[in-house]
């Protein structure tokens, strides 16, 4: 499924904005929910956080089977493509020309970016990915992490201030927990196996 949907992303010359919605016959619906651009689960446009998530998953595919040669360049292309959504922090959605539709900054895209940057650094040993990993963590530490009460803020406004427009409270833990674990696991392992392999865990 991943290779069919993503296998030529790095050849598309800019057509990396992934379609989010399809009908029952897998025909793309690029205008789905155009009248509800801020929908928290089915928004109009393309979601850069999902580009980052797919990039991370492609690297895990590469870790399981390095003969899937499409997976590494696809991950690199998607990771770099998400730069267009950094304003700073990743905006929730962009239109098909790359302009922001919903400029909310949610917590989960940066956690996916942290994992992707870490795995790319492991695989390529390129300094740009190590620097990206550190930059993303510094941004998260400054704006998303709630140092008074723990966990993360789940949404920031355009001025990077915490707000509660979409969710109230702190409804999600697994994204931020994963972000904290990436430094201890390899792209070749899932979280459980990776942590088992750590003798100090």
What are these regions (language model features)?
Residues 1-10:
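Single conserved hydrophobic/aromatic residue that forms the stacking wall/gate
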Residues 3-4, 29-80, 96-142, 158-201:
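Aromatic (Trp/Tyr) and acidic
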Residues 19-20, 72:
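Short beta-strand segments
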Residues 91-94, 146-159:
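A glycine-biased, small/acidic residue-tolerant capping/turn segment at secondary-structure junctions
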């Amino acid at each position: 499924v991943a290779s069919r949907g993503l296998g030529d992303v790095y050849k598309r010359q800019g057509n990396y904005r992934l379609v989010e919605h399809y009908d029952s016959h897998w025909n793309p619906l690029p205008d789905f929910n155009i009248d509800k651009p801020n929908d928290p689960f089915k928004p109009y446009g393309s979601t850069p956080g999902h580009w980052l998530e797919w990039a991370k998953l492609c690297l895990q595919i590469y870790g399981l089977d390095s003969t899937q040669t499409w997976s590494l360049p696809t991950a690199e292309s998607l990771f770099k493509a998400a730069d267009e959504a950094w304003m700073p922090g990743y905006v929730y959605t962009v239109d098909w020309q790359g302009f922001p539709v919903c400029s909310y900054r949610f917590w989960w895209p940066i956690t996916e970016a942290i994992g992707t940057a870490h795995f790319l650094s492991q695989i390529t040993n390129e300094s740009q990915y190590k620097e990206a990993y550190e930059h993303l963590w510094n941004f998260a530490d400054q704006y998303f992490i709630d140092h008074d009460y723990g966990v993360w803020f789940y949404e920031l406004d355009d001025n990077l201030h915490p707000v509660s427009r979409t969710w109230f409270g702190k409804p999600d833990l697994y994204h931020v927990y994963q972000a904290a674990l990436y430094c201890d696991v390899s792209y070749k392992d899932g979280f459980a196996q990776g942590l088992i392999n750590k003798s100090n865990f």
